Amino acid sequence: MADKNERAIKVVAENRKARFNYAIEDTIEAGISLTGTEVKSVRSGKSTIAESYADSRGGEIWLINANIPEYLQANRFNHEPKRPRKLLLHRKQINKLMGAVERQGMTLIPLKLYFNEKGRAKLLLALAKGKQLHDKRETEKKRDWSREKGRLLRARG
């Protein structure tokens, strides 16, 4: 049996550019439907969600363009690396997210792919609005200033 320290949340993939390219409005945790070889490949830590997004098809939400490479030890029963993957959400959550996407022109982007305490694959999904170029520049200036401020405070002692 694993200790409590070993059962902590294990982040496997992170979309680091998402917070720079989008203004995050709301986040929601969703389960993700994976096959056996996909789970093993995700556990190895080689999956990427940097250029992926979520979209609705037939009243369900799907993760599009997420790259989970083929599992090396699997033979002919391997999975397709960029196939759409179903996200597991309650109907109320799906309606809320799709309403925001359709009415307010928002986007669903994944922020993190991780395993929770129970060992289930979860995806932190964000309801976001794309930033304009000047907003990105402003974010970069704020980040640079906060770094510079920290350096100055450390130098003064």
Curated annotation (Swiss-Prot):
Residues 135-151 have a biased composition (Basic and acidic residues). One of its GO terms (biological process) is trans-translation. Gene3D superfamilies: 2.40.280.10. One of its GO terms (cellular component) is cytosol. Keywords: Cytoplasm, RNA-binding. Required for rescue of stalled ribosomes mediated by trans-translation. Binds to transfer-messenger RNA (tmRNA), required for stable association of tmRNA with ribosomes. tmRNA and SmpB together mimic tRNA shape, replacing the anticodon stem-loop with SmpB. tmRNA is encoded by the ssrA gene; the 2 termini fold to resemble tRNA(Ala) and it encodes a 'tag peptide', a short internal open reading frame. During trans-translation Ala-aminoacylated tmRNA acts like a tRNA, entering the A-site of stalled ribosomes, displacing the stalled mRNA. Belongs to the SmpB family. PANTHER family: SSRA-BINDING PROTEIN, TMRNA-BINDING COMPONENT OF TRANS-TRANSLATION TAGGING COMPLEX. This is SsrA-binding protein. The lineage of its organism: Bacteria, Pseudomonadati, Pseudomonadota, Alphaproteobacteria, Hyphomicrobiales. The gene is smpB.
